C-alpha cells in the first residue's frame, strides 16, 4: 500500500474533523453493538435455554432488539457522514486538479489527451470517493470488529482463540503474492479507460467528418479494439481478486470449522458450556467476515490508489511561476516588433517554423499577413500570446521584451480570434461576454456592429438563446461573428485575426472589416488572410514564406514586385 498517497488524502480529510468524529463514534457504536450481541447469545443459551428460564430469554431478546436499534441508528450516521465527507473531498480534489490544469502552460497540453483529462477528472476522482468510503468506513469497522472479536474469543476460550490467531497471518501470503499483479493491472485498466474516453471524445467531436467519409465501421472497429483491451485488463484484475477472495474465505471458514469441531469436543468433555461455544462461534464468524472484508478491501484498494496517483500528478505539477516580471510601461501608442525570432514546436524540434524573422508594427496600423500553409503565420500569434517561447530572438511590445513581462499582462492588451471560433455551451450572450465585464449598452452596440443582431432578432430568446455544446446550433459564420464580438468587446490594443472571417462571404467580410477598422483606430490589427481581397486595404502586408518575411508592402506594391504574392492572389482570389 502506498502510504504517501494515503497521507496526501488525509491532508484533504483534515478539514472535516467534526464529520469524521461522528463517523468514528458511529463505527465504534456499530462494532460494539455487534460484539455485545455475542455476549447476549451466551446468556440466552446458558441462562435461558439450558436452565429453561423464560425471563432470561425475554431479557436477552430485549437486549438484542435494543442493540439492533443502536446498530441501525449508528449505521445511518456512519453511512450519511462518510459519504458526505467523500463527496466533499472528491469535489475539493476535483477543484484543485481542474484549477491547476487550466493554468498549465499551453505546451503541456501537447502531451495530454482530452479524453485522458476527462477520465482523470471524472472516473478517477469517483474512485477516490470509493477509497474514502471503503477505507474510513469498512476497513476501520472491520479492523475494530476483528480486534474486538479476537479479544472476546480469548475470554471465551484461550485454546480456540489461539487457533484462530494462527490462521489470520497466513492470509498475508496471498496479499503479497497477488497484490503486485493487481496493482499493475489496476494501472493498466485506468490507462485503457482513458484511451476509451479519448476515442469517444475524438469521435463525437468529428462526427460530421466520420459520416461524410463513411467512417462509422472503421471507428466502431477501433473503439471495439480499445474496449477489448480494457475488458482484458479489467477481467484479469477481477480474476485475480476473485481467486484471492475465494482462497481467503475458504481458508477463514475452514479455520472456523476447525474451531467448531474442537469446541464441540470440549463441550462433550465439559470444558465449555453451550453458551460459550455459541458465543465463540459468533465471534469467530465476525472475525472471519471482518478479516475477509479487510483482505478484500486491500486487494480492491489498488484501483483507487492508482487513480489517486494519476490525480496527484496533475495537482503536484505546478505551473511555472515567475516573481521577477517587469512592469508593463504605459504608453500613448502601442508598438510591436519581432527581432530575429527562431522557433520550432516542442513536439517537432527538428522542424523549423520561424527562421530569423523580423518585422515592426506601429500603432494605428492594419497589418495583413499572407503565405502558404505551414509558413509560420499562425505561429507568430501563438508567440505573441506567450503560448510558446521562441528559441532565440526578441519580441517587443512597447519596446519591452515580452519574455520579461507577465504573460497575463500581455494578454490583457490582446484579443485573439482563431481560425476555428471558440464557442462554449451556454447562450449567445454568455459567449460574447466571456472574459469581458461590459454594460448592456456595449453588448447591444457590438452585436449590431458584428451583424449578430441580424440572426438573433429572428430566433426565440434572441441573444439569450441556448446554442448547444460548441455552438452546434450555429452556422460557421454565426460562430465567427460571436467570436469577433467577444474580441472587440475586450477593447484590445492589439487585435489578432487568424482567418477569423473565412466562413463569411466577401461582402459581409468587407463590411465587418470596415467596422473593425473604425473601432480599432489608433490600435493595431493583424489579420492572417486566406483571401487577399480581405486585406487589400491593409496599411502593410507581410508575405511569410518558410518562416521568414519574403516581402512586404501595400497590395498594389506587392502585385508589382512579388512573384509569390501574385501567385497566391491568382490561386485564391481569382479562382
UniProtKB/Swiss-Prot annotation:
SUPFAM superfamilies on file: ABC transporter transmembrane region, P-loop containing nucleoside triphosphate hydrolases
Residues given in the record as ATP binding sites: 371-378
An example Gene Ontology CC term for this record: plasma membrane
InterPro entries, per the entry: AAA+_ATPase, ABC1_TM_dom, ABC1_TM_sf, ABC_transporter-like_ATP-bd, ABC_transporter-like_CS, P-loop_NTPase, Type_1_exporter
Top-rank taxon, per record: Bacteria
Keywords assigned by UniProt, alphabetized: ATP-binding, Cell inner membrane, Cell membrane, Membrane, Nucleotide-binding, Translocase, Transmembrane, Transmembrane helix, Transport
Domain ABC transporter: 336-571
Annotated localization: Cell inner membrane
Transmembrane region(s): 21-41, 61-81, 135-155, 158-178, 242-262, 277-297
Enzyme Commission number(s) of this protein: 7.-.-.-
GO MF, one annotated term: ABC-type oligopeptide transporter activity
Pfam families: ABC_membrane, ABC_tran
Top class in the EC scheme: translocase
Keyword Cell membrane listed: yes
Record membrane topology: Multi-pass membrane protein
Entry-linked PANTHER family: ATP-BINDING CASSETTE SUB-FAMILY B MEMBER 10, MITOCHONDRIAL, ATP-DEPENDENT PERMEASE MDL1, MITOCHONDRIAL
Entry remark concerning the domains of this protein: The ATP-binding domain (NBD) and the transmembrane domain (TMD) are fused.
Known partners and oligomeric status: Homodimer.
Free-text function comment from the UniProt entry: Part of an ABC transporter complex. Transmembrane domains (TMD) form a pore in the inner membrane and the ATP-binding domain (NBD) is responsible for energy generation.
Family: Belongs to the ABC transporter superfamily.
Entry protein name: Putative export ATP-binding/permease protein RBE_0492
Lineage of source species: Bacteria, Pseudomonadati, Pseudomonadota, Alphaproteobacteria, Rickettsiales
